[in-house]
A protein has these predicted regions:
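Glycan-recognition and catalytic cores of secretory/periplasmic carbohydrate-active enzymes
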Residues: 1-375
Length: 375
């Protein structure tokens, strides 16, 4: 079925997506325009409780600021005052988190705005890069591109280890913490590189992305099942996460540059195995963490993993029924009139009722994938 006709040929799925997306625009986004926004700090609170009150602040993270910058950048032209909010978040990223002495960005500040965890971590820098690429695409301001370039420079000069991979964490002055590479920050770096390439030509970024994926295949792919492990092969106490398998699959399958790569072939081969081990066939719930020997390490159901599985399904062949089934599961199990449930336990009981500021990023990228799927 041609993509352009999906919305016409699947009125039930289209109506369901319209309802879910309306909930996002009418319920979830306003939470972060109103009660989730600390106007004094010009930062989002880390989380809201079920009554939409901010949890008492312990810290503010640069990564959370960057994810909300992506969120409101994506809403420019769709939601009133999204551009003003994105501009405020961009300013706050620099004002609160940028390290003027050593370069790069701190992990977190305390409730008064003083640097708290001053380490430099790849996960944070990847999201700053990702958010700035999307924001620059919308506003084309030179200052935004200069921050994008600064983030790319820091990643290449400070985090890179010369083998296609990157340190997960460094000290404030860029000295080694012997962290080594970890899957999740590297995935978000790949996502950030793809975002950069979607808004401009950049040969250095393209080469870095290809080298990263080549190194991921070599260092992280389990040779038997072709799943991506969370730590490099041979590390003690290793595991894999179905949500991350699905997230990687979407990034690779949706990229003409990476589709057909060896890493893509591995994730393609592992997809059915990941579904079989990591998704409850009755409820569609995605399990959080698995051992290779089939033992669930953590059977918690998290909304972000549900969103990533749903987004990945939009790129699978003959997936119309499963896309609709998973969208219904997301709506029925995780969305509610006041927002969303972040986690359910193995029995399906709600185990986390607060709503973190970082989750709308996952929903926004999922819904973007669904909108493209429906044409």
């Amino acid at each position: 079925m041609p993509h352009a006709s999906r919305s016409a040929s699947q009125p039930e799925l289209t109506a369901l997506f319209t309802s879910v997306h309306q909930h996002f625009q009418d319920v979830i986004v306003p939470l972060w325009q109103g009660p989730g926004w600390n106007a004094d700090m010009a930062l989002p609170y880390e989380a809201l409780d079920a009554e939409h009150k901010p949890l008492p602040p312990q810290r503010y993270r640069a990564m959370a600021c960057a994810r909300q910058l992506y969120l409101f950048s994506s809403l420019i032209g769709q939601v009133p005052k999204a551009e003003e909010r994105a501009a405020a978040l961009f300013r706050s990223l620099q004002r609160h988190f940028h390290d003027a002495e050593h370069g790069g960005w701190f992990y977190s500040i305390d409730p008064q705005g003083t640097p708290l965890d001053q380490r430099k971590d790849l996960y944070t820098h990847a999201f700053i890069l990702f958010a700035c690429a999307h924001y620059w695409d919308k506003v084309r301001e030179p200052l935004v591109e200069s921050v994008l370039n600064a983030a790319l420079e820091v990643v290449a000069q400070r985090f890179a280890t010369g083998d296609g991979l990157y340190e997960a964490s460094l000290d404030r002055d860029w000295s080694s913490l012997d962290s080594g590479p970890l899957q999740n920050p590297l995935m978000h770096l790949a996502e950030a590189f793809l975002a950069t390439l979607s808004v401009r030509e950049d040969a250095a970024v393209q080469n870095a992305l290809i080298e990263l994926c080549t190194a991921m295949q070599k260092r992280f792919i389990d040779p038997r099942h072709a799943v991506l492990m969370e730590k490099p092969l041979g590390a003690v106490d290793n595991w894999f996460e179905p949500g991350h398998q699905f997230e990687w699959y979407f990034l690779l399958q949706s990229s003409p540059l990476l589709r057909g790569s060896t890493l893509h072939a591995s994730l393609e081969r592992a997809f059915a195995f990941t579904e079989q081990r990591g998704v409850d066939q009755q409820t569609g719930a995605v399990r959080a963490m698995l051992e290779l020997d089939d033992h669930p390490r953590d059977a918690t159901q998290r909304i972000w993993a549900q969103a990533e599985y749903l987004r990945a399904l939009t790129l699978r062949p003959d997936s119309e029924a499963s896309v609709q089934r998973q969208l219904q599961a997301l709506q029925q199990s995780f969305l509610h009139a006041g927002g969303w449930y972040e986690c359910r336990d193995e029995q399906g009981e709600v185990s986390r009722k607060d709503m973190p500021s970082t989750t709308p990023y996952h929903l926004a990228t999922c819904y973007r994938g669904l909108a493209e799927y429906l044409g």
